Amino acid sequence: DYRPTVADPAGTKPDEQYESKAIVFIGALISTERPGMRSLINYLVKETDFFTAPASAKYHSSYCGGLLDHSLNVYMRLKDTYFSEVERNSTPLDDQQKRAIEDSIVISALLHDVCKANFYVWGSRNVKDPQAGQWKAVPWITYDEKMPYGNHGDKSVFLIERYIRLTITEAFAIRFHMGEYSTD
């Protein structure tokens, strides 16, 4: 059973589509038929907060379930871009080439930020309501680095390869997905 449990950190909950999003995420990974994939999924479901974690502390998708949403958004965007480019490309691909590329898109996009699971910590901080002049506790996200291992691209590659073998292209796509924003 790959249905993730729902955490309720700091009184927040994932949105109503949470379960269907998790099913799409898991189904896409299983569709690659990559050896070890079910073990990786089992790890994500049972040993991490991947499906309820935020994608960041304050920038993109910084809410419960944000990491799942962000990963699916990257996947859909990359898939759409790939198919648009294939239509314009004059060199047709055979079915095996298409399948290999599609599998790499699934793996690279959905797993690029896997290192953010078990990374963010939900807490609260006091914020003054400017209208009422009262202080109130609001949910706040910090982080707790339990596994320092290079930058987050390096760490994602390391975690993924504990379960599945990445192609060179997948490893580079994940490692360098921050592009110009990578710190090293």
What are these regions (language model features)?
Residues S56-A57, S61-Y63, M76, T81-F83, ...:
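Divalent metal-dependent catalytic cores for phosphoryl transfer on phosphate-bearing substrates
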Residues K21, F25, G36-L40, H70, ...:
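Residue-level detector of well-ordered alpha-helical segments, enriched
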Residues I30-P35, G66, Q97-A100:
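Structural motif
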Residues D1-A53:
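Non-catalytic interface/linker regions that flank or bridge core catalytic/transmembrane domains
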Residues A53-P54, H70:
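Surface-exposed loop/turn and secondary-structure junction residues enriched for glycine/proline
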Residues D15-E19, L67, Y149:
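Generic alpha-helical segment signature
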Residues S39-T48, H60-L72:
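All-alpha helical catalytic cores of prenyl diphosphate-utilizing isoprenoid enzymes
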